[in-house]
């Protein structure tokens, strides 16, 4: 169920302050954040935000198609290593 429009987008205040500070300074350095739950807003377009995935910070370059999505959607937390190979099929 999507968030109500009357509530507006959720973004952590500490992240919003970092984004506004980088916008004023014209800084292109990645902004480190642990806030995976924050929504991407139009002010973030063109910025690189390093989102923590539990082990490291994954750099995410924000484009206009990402607006309205959460930061955590672009930083996968699980590593898929593939299913176990079938040894019978390899021998044939």
UniProtKB/Swiss-Prot annotation:
Keywords: Ribonucleoprotein, Ribosomal protein, RNA-binding, rRNA-binding
Any one Gene Ontology BP term: ribosomal small subunit assembly
PROSITE patterns according to UniProt: RIBOSOMAL_S19
Disulfide bonds listed in the record: none
GO MF, one annotated term: rRNA binding
Similarity field: Belongs to the universal ribosomal protein uS19 family.
Its job: Protein S19 forms a complex with S13 that binds strongly to the 16S ribosomal RNA.
Name of this protein: Small ribosomal subunit protein uS19
Gene: rpsS
